[in-house]
Amino acid sequence: MKQFLLDEDRIPFSEGDTIMQAARRAGKYVPHLCWHPDLGQSGACRVCVVKADDRLVAACTTQVCENMRVENRSTELDDKRRLLLQMLFVEGNHFCPGCEKSGDCQLQATAAEMGMLDLHYEEFYPDRPVDASHADIWIDFDRCILCKLCVRASHEIDKKGVFAIGGYGIKTHLLINSSTGKLDKSDLSADDAAAHICPVGAILPKRVGFLHPIGMRKFDITPIAFETPGADDAID
């Protein structure tokens, strides 16, 4: 079987594999927020940046080739990831102690793995609406990191197209495909993949807030880098 080098470890891969796919199959953690094994490629967050043959690339969109040398967990790359995470934190409302997703949040867990101890940048303090119109699901747009997972899940898995992305630059935002732009008039169901795939606390089910006590939450038990490959990507 063909192999490539990932942080000096020889990793087997199949034809057409991306660096992310081959690494995850081999049990190697590549930090990510917008990648999911059940969805197509996106490259939206760039947290999975690696150095392949001395070029910076996204691990989730770059196909691996034989004898490629990939650098993943280096001080340089983790520093770049930490800067990206800090920008995501200050752009939205990510006050972890007050968020129901705390302890189960992929953004929070990845920041901890990258050694993020402060925000570094000045906070934006956005004032975006909360949509609680749906009977079972609510959205806090201030927490959305524009990973597009809900958009892609709704299109690719649910076949509904409930979500989309609109606007440009700092005004880029999540859209709801309904006559009113509200969730209650959309085709979203509580059991849709799009309703449960959010890696942060932007899309959450109602009536189950703070279900798990501190110490018993997902990433309290197992740090994100030590989970079984794909476990942190499971759709609940």
What are these regions (language model features)?
Residues M1-D9:
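Eukaryote-biased recognition of intrinsically disordered, low-complexity regulatory segments
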Residues I11-E66, K80:
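N-terminal cofactor/phosphate-binding cores enriched in small/glycine residues
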Residues R46-V47, R55-D236:
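Fe-S ferredoxin-like electron-transfer domains
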